Regions:
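Membrane-interacting alpha-helical segments
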Residues: 2-6, 10-17
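Active-site and donor-binding regions of nucleotide-sugar-utilizing enzymes
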Residues: 15-177
Length: 177
């Protein structure tokens, strides 16, 4: 509940945040709208595999997997989401045929539902420790398989999660693998 209130407060001030990020060239002038549920890429009918990683390191770590999946005839499209402009630019260096990039939506209930309704992924794979409560809850409400890949937790993070033990347990049980 507290998280949802906070994320909606951030949404209210997001135009100011986006303006400063555009000024600092940390947002793409035409693509920042993807974070608000305006899609710039077309979904192809068929099986879509979705990977999400925060930034460059996470995206680079999945390139070998994407290269293999590109050759799988059952998979029609591979969607990669991230939060940073630099990770988007890295992906453009590769000449993938089935793989596209979109920015991850703001983690409100509305934006995450809109994202899932449009893309309809067969499976969602979150790389490292990218944890977005509204998105993860909506993924499970849509009966989409959810994988946390290459996850790790530091001692510091573990102590923080332990403060909210029942919430953490409920949350992490949403992952299939």
């Amino acid at each position: 509940f507290i998280y949802r209130v906070l994320i909606n407060l951030i949404l209210i001030i997001s135009p100011v945040i986006i303006f400063f990020r555009l000024f600092k060239k940390k947002e793409h002038p035409s693509r920042f709208k993807e974070k608000f549920g305006f899609f710039t890429k077309r979904k192809i009918d068929g099986k879509l595999i979705w990977f999400h990683g925060a930034s460059v390191g996470e995206i680079l770590s999945i390139i070998p997997i994407i290269e293999k999946l590109e050759n799988n005839k059952e998979i029609k499209q591979i969607l990669i989401t991230s939060n940073t402009l630099s990770s988007s630019k890295i992906l453009s260096d590769f000449k993938f045929k089935k793989t596209i990039h979109q920015f991850f939506p703001i983690d409100t209930n509305y934006h995450t539902k809109k994202f899932l309704d449009y893309w309809k992924p067969s499976i969602a794979i979150f790389v490292d420790s990218e944890i977005w409560p509204n998105m993860i809850s909506n993924i499970k409400e849509n009966s989409i398989s959810l994988i946390l890949m290459n996850a790790r937790i530091t001692d510091k993070s573990f102590k923080k999660w332990k403060l909210f033990n029942s919430t953490a347990k409920t949350f992490f049980q949403k992952f299939d693998i």
